[in-house]
Amino acid sequence: MKVLALAVLLLAVCSLEGAFVRRQAEEPNLQSLVAQYFQTMTDYGKDLVEKAKGPELQAQAKAYFEKTQEQLTPLVKKAGTDLINFLSNFMDLRTQPATQ
């Protein structure tokens, strides 16, 4: 019986000691989390700049831009022509009643 009581007492003391140690452990504060976040973002930005300096990425961007321009130029010209036709039709409708 004494051994059982001693075991329960030892278990209680150990669990209380563990809880006390956990409370004393330093919790990360908001300032350190924000500083770590900004440091990570800065490192990511530096890596991105290093990658962007490479000629391969610049060549890909240039090819993409040229392809996009090739595809959009006819569409823009057609839209401009359609707009001019629409406005000229609208202007013709306005001038016809005035001449009658």
Curated annotation (Swiss-Prot):
GO BP term, example: cholesterol transport
GO cellular component: spherical high-density lipoprotein particle
Annotated function: May stabilize HDL (high density lipoprotein) structure by its association with lipids, and affect the HDL metabolism.
Subcellular location: Secreted
A GO MF term: lipid binding
Name of the featured protein: Apolipoprotein A-II
Record's keyword terms, sorted: Cleavage on pair of basic residues, HDL, Lipid transport, Oxidation, Phosphoprotein, Pyrrolidone carboxylic acid, Secreted, Signal, Transport
Gene label: APOA2
Record's subunit section: Monomer. Interacts with NAXE and NDRG1.
